[in-house]
Structure formats: C-alpha cells, structure tokens
C-alpha cells in the first residue's frame, strides 16, 4: 500500500522523522522549492537515503515536480507557457526544451514530471488555457509528442517520466469552471479531447497519465472505469501508471456528487476503476485500504496490478540501479547557458495580430515613448501558473483567497498576510536576477522612456486614467501593456482555484 502512496516535501521540512516516510513511500511531491539545484540535489540524496533505510525492501522513492516550461526550481530553464509554444508550431523547439529539462531534472534526482497538459482548450472561460497548446487537437497532439520525446529520451533509464494530464475533458466543463462536469458526449470525448493523449501514448510512449478533477456521466473521472480502464487502457492501449490529480480521491466525499461513504470507500472505488497511485499524500491509499484487503472486501489482484505498475516505472527509470541524484554526471551539460534558446522560443511565441502603417519596428531610439499599463512594471505578471516564479506564492495563504485545488489546507499553509505583488517580484528577482520587466528592457533601448501604471491588473477601483492619457498625449508612441495574473487564488484573474460552484 505504501508504495502506491505519496507525501509532500516543502522547504521547511527539515525533520524527516515528522514526515510520512516510516515503512517507505512510493512518491514524494516537491513543492515550494527554494534551494538552488545543487543544494536540492544534495537534500534529495539525504531524503532518498532515509526512505530506503526505512523501507522493508529498500525501495527508493520517486520524486516529482511540475515542469511545463522548466522545473519549478530556482536557476533552472524557463520557457514560455504552452499556449505560447503552441503559437510557434515548432515541435523541434519543444523537443529541445524538454531535452534540457530532462538533463536538469536528472541532475537533481527528480525523475517524474507532472507535465505536459494535453487538455484541448475550446472554452476560453476556463482558467488554465495558458497551460495548453490551444484549441486544435492535432496541434496539441504534435506538440505533446515532441514534449514527451524530449523529456523521456530514447531510453527511459536516462530520462524523466512525463505525465499526460488531465484525462479526460477537463477543459470542457460547465461554464468553464474548475472541478465541475465535463460537457462532451462519448464521440467528442474520443475524437477531440482524447486525440492528444492517444498520440502521446502510441507515438511517444508516455509512461504516466493523470486524471481530471471533473466528472463525466455522473462519475468522478478518478473513479470511472469507463475512462481509466475501458477507454484509456483497452482502446488507447496505455500500459503505464495512472496517478491522481492532487486529492482527487477526497473529492468523492467533499463535493456535491459525494459517491463514497468514507475515504476508504472512495479509495477502493478509484483503485478498482484503474487509479494506481494517490497524490500528493496518503489519505485513501492508506491504513484503511490495508484493512479492507485484509478483510477480503476487495480482490487483492487490484493491489497487485497497481504495485506492479509503480515498480515497473521505477525499474524503467533505472531507479533501482541508481536511486540518488546524478549531479556529477549531468550538471555540466544540464546547466550550460540556455538564455539564447529561451529567448528564441519567446520571440517565436509572440503573435503580431496586425501592423497598420508599418508602425513596427520602432527604429528611432530617440523617440519619446510612453509605456502604460500594469503589465509593464511587474515580473510576476509575465509568468503563468505552474512556473517557478508563480510557485513562490502557492502556499502563501492570502486573505480572502482560494488556493490551488488539492494543496490549500492548513498542513501546507504559511502565515496569513495581505498579498503584496512587489514582494513577490523581489522574490522572483532573487531566484532569477537576470529577469527584467518590460519597462526595464525598453529603458535600455529607448532612453526617453516613461512609465505610467494607469490601472491595476485586478482591482477596477485603482485607476489613474488621467495620468495615462497625459503620458500618451505627450509621447511620440505608446506601448500599452495590459495584463492579467495567472495562478492560484483571488489575487489572480485567471488560473486554477478551488472554487467550482457556490456551496451553500
């Protein structure tokens, strides 16, 4: 049972005896990572040694983190969000990107990436569109295959296991809301939303799949045999590991659907449907499940099947041969300068919708330039969710805020404070000192350049339109940087939160 469970590790976790590691653990979720890569590798070596010493069979843990445009670790590679990469139509660029991510994660000892996002974004109200490659299933399929091929490599024993998420129909929910019902019939589900997953399975050999938070035909996806076994395995021929999106099992108790009597019942529903491993902690796949098997409430073959899939993936990754981070082997190549490649990807991701009168480029560097808008002066607003800069604020419980689904509870919370965007920018600058705001970059090119905020990115009452108009009228050209903020909580205007429908 323990090898099919997981526990979370955050920066403050220095006492391993206080963690759920006694008897071993299947995976460890790395969240709120503050260490630089070499220090993190050293820390994970110590954690792995502790896990193996406390495992009856010395089974190593598998570490995982998000890696959509780079590992969520300071001083690692950081590419544009997937929606920008989709705009490049450049599969070779994506493959090169994930090849770099692969070597960096290998060096640090993180062999499981909870990426890519293969949801097809048809409803632009859905807050996680930026994590996808857009609304074309064929483009998403091509990009996802490139992502997986670069990340897993030609031989998985030197690669990182990719995760196709979120299976299935997560982006096509009622009203574009998170954690709600998928609005797609069986045909559309297969022909549109399953297409990128099938490509990643058949053409790229992806090794793990993560369930969607949504429900389909009255069943939560994590407990749907129709989706996780009949469709995913029998029709699409997936033979790898299925992991839960964070605390999906618990949702069988918490939400309006409420299909389970207790957490053990919820876990058994998920296990028999085809969910092999529970992330990010052991709530259902725990002692209650052990007792259920001992009492003969469910066939032991379901447990054997899941354990085999977990151990198979660990063997494929070479974890039993080399369980520790391979810093010496990989770090030189992994952390060679990548700025040129990242800048190329960023340039290719930018879409010019029109250029009337050949206004661009602004070749005269002496012009008076007015830069207006909240997006020009903040580093944080440049980054989407599931990037290292946005993860810096994930566990900061903000007044009147909702957190990322699956992690916003008291066990991971930091002290409550009012959200401070400038403070987040300062933290980003510490981990990425080379980063510049749009205004800072423009100042280097146009000496006669001024900045006016004009409005807030979120609060409609915080405006100074008069100052913005005055700046525009006195300038030769205006660069207007309107922006939202993508991430978790009510201090963001797009992204993922734990609110779905209003609960009474």
Residue map of PLM features:
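Glycoside hydrolase catalytic-domain context in secreted enzymes
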Residues: 1-502
